């Protein structure tokens, strides 16, 4: 069995039918979905993976996943006054000293081509997972240029760095795409052939990333895939995302640390899955004989309102909704206390009301299906935040 190691990299901090596929180089040493070596006979090279965004939700779960498969993990973080490594510190043998184990961190940045070239040339990866992004939709309206630099041009920089290093025939590339590409949806559910209609600077930047991956795949015979991932959450989700805001707030209410919290559009519906399920799909995409693009989703939709109700149900409380529009409130049954209020500042300039994915292609070709249900997802997040607020009320 081949030895494996992982080089990981972090920066900021989570389709139409693919055109014709190209045959891949036999030196890639990939595995099919059953774990069988594909084209690796006589290839003694270690399998090396490079992940951008290792300090984020998806990057940390992917690092864990690959470590369990005996990968060695190296990570690159942006230079800053403080380390942003909370999600991966447990992967060190000595978390306080950031030493030991099979993971090391290095410095790099998605906005700096030279650092990408140096890293790729040094580690000579066989797999690259591009997870780094400014991924908050509402923030992208305020930081539109930065979002484009990281999410759009950053993807181009990595692809060009691969070619600069002369490794386009030896590297398998995964691009983290997003269901936000569908935006103002033209059909439900959305699959790989559904037209895009992006509704935010984030989605527009990701759309460029999506198409430049396909362009490089066809122009340079690269093994490059887009994973169109629908919303996926976990206890490691960023605090500024609505799902984590809900579970943190309900946990504070449970501990009597907060009376109510504010939200925006309660009726926005999303296809929510668990991040741990979705990183497995990323890996599966790079183990096939030829590259393609895949929608990864649960196929179920739930509203923000339902997420709130499920979170309160976890602490044995029920919410009744009263009023309309910005005057609507969520009232706790029994006590009559208002627990949820609407604040227009949380509305997006252009809303995306409904996203629901059709992952039948991934199920058919990758043998991938989600394992964690919506209720289990909310429960997992609630348990973690209740414990977090118990230990640190000001977290």
UniProtKB/Swiss-Prot annotation:
GO terms for biological process: 'de novo' GDP-L-fucose biosynthetic process; cell fate commitment; oogenesis; positive regulation of Notch signaling pathway. Residues 1-44 are annotated as: Disordered. Coiled coil: none annotated. Its cofactor is NADP(+). CDD domains: GDP_MD_SDR_e (cd05260). Signal peptide: none annotated. The keyword Cytoplasm does not apply. One of its GO terms (molecular function) is GDP-mannose 4,6-dehydratase activity. Residues 1-13, 24-36 have a biased composition (Polar residues). It catalyses: GDP-alpha-D-mannose = GDP-4-dehydro-alpha-D-rhamnose + H2O. Its EC number is 4.2.1.47. PANTHER family: GDP-MANNOSE 4,6 DEHYDRATASE, GDP-MANNOSE 4,6-DEHYDRATASE. This is GDP-mannose 4,6 dehydratase. It comes from Drosophila melanogaster.
């Amino acid at each position: 069995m081949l030895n494996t190691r992982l080089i990981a990299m972090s920066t900021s901090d989570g389709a139409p039918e693919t055109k014709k596929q190209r045959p891949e180089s036999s030196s890639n040493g990939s595995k099919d979905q059953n774990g069988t070596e594909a084209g690796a006979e006589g290839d003694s090279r270690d399998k090396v993976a490079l992940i951008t965004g290792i300090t984020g939700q998806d990057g940390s779960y992917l690092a864990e996943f690959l470590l369990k498969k005996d990968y060695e993990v190296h990570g690159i973080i942006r230079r800053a006054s403080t380390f942003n490594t909370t999600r991966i510190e447990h992967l060190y043998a000595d978390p306080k000293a950031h030493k030991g184990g099979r993971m090391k961190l290095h410095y790099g940045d998605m906005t700096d081509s030279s650092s990408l070239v140096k890293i790729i040339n040094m580690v000579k990866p066989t797999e690259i997972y591009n997870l780094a992004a400014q991924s908050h939709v509402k923030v992208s309206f305020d930081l539109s240029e930065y979002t484009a630099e990281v999410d759009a041009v950053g993807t181009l920089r990595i692809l060009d760095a691969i070619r600069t290093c002369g490794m386009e025939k030896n590297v398998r590339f995964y691009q983290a795409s997003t269901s936000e590409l569908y935006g103002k949806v033209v059909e439900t559910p959305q699959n790989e052939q559904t037209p895009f209609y992006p509704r935010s600077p984030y989605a527009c930047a990701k759309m460029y990333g999506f198409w430049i991956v396909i362009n490089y795949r066809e122009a340079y015979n690269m093994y490059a895939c887009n994973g169109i991932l629908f919303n996926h959450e976990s206890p490691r989700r960023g605090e500024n995302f609505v799902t984590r805001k809900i579970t943190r707030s309900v946990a504070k209410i449970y501990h009597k640390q907060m009376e109510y919290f504010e939200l925006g559009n309660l009726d926005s519906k999303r296809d929510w899955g668990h991040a741990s399920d979705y990183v497995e799909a990323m890996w599966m995409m790079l183990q096939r004989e030829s590259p393609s693009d895949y929608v990864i989703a649960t196929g179920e939709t739930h509203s923000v309102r339902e997420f709130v109700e499920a979170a309160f149900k976890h602490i044995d409380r029920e919410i009744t909704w009263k009023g309309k529009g910005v005057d609507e409130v969520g009232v706790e049954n029994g006590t009559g206390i208002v627990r949820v209020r609407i604040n227009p500042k949380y509305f997006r300039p252009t809303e995306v009301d409904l996203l629901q994915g059709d992952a039948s292609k991934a199920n058919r070709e990758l043998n991938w299906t989600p394992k964690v249900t919506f209720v289990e997802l909310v429960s997992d997040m609630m348990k973690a935040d209740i414990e977090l607020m118990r230990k640190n009320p000001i977290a």
